[in-house]
């Protein structure tokens, strides 16, 4: 299973395709935080905010478009959670 994922990612890289790496196995292979667990949203928002504060800007680069959308969604969810608590 992991070997198949590695083969698919390698082939995609050679063919200049984009993979947003949303799955568990893909993120384990490349050493990123896996998109799972109850604390993932809060951790992701914290790390994303910290990174952008250091850069002092949220990038509008098209390659970071998905990250910008995720940031907005997570920010809205955290605001809703604060209102409920």
From Swiss-Prot:
Segment forming the signal sequence: none
GO molecular function: DNA-directed RNA polymerase activity
Keyword Lyase found: no
Annotated localization: Plastid, Chloroplast
Keyword annotations: Chloroplast, DNA-directed RNA polymerase, Nucleotidyltransferase, Plastid, Transcription, Transferase
Disulfide bonds, paired cysteine numbers: none
One GO CC term, this protein: mitochondrion
Quaternary structure (record): In plastids the minimal PEP RNA polymerase catalytic core is composed of four subunits: alpha, beta, beta', and beta''. When a (nuclear-encoded) sigma factor is associated with the core the holoenzyme is formed, which can initiate transcription.
This protein's record includes keyword Iron: no
Catalyzed reaction equations: RNA(n) + a ribonucleoside 5'-triphosphate = RNA(n+1) + diphosphate
This enzyme's EC code(s): 2.7.7.6
Name of the protein this chain belongs to: DNA-directed RNA polymerase subunit beta''
Taxonomic lineage from the root: Eukaryota, Rhodophyta, Bangiophyceae, Galdieriales, Galdieriaceae
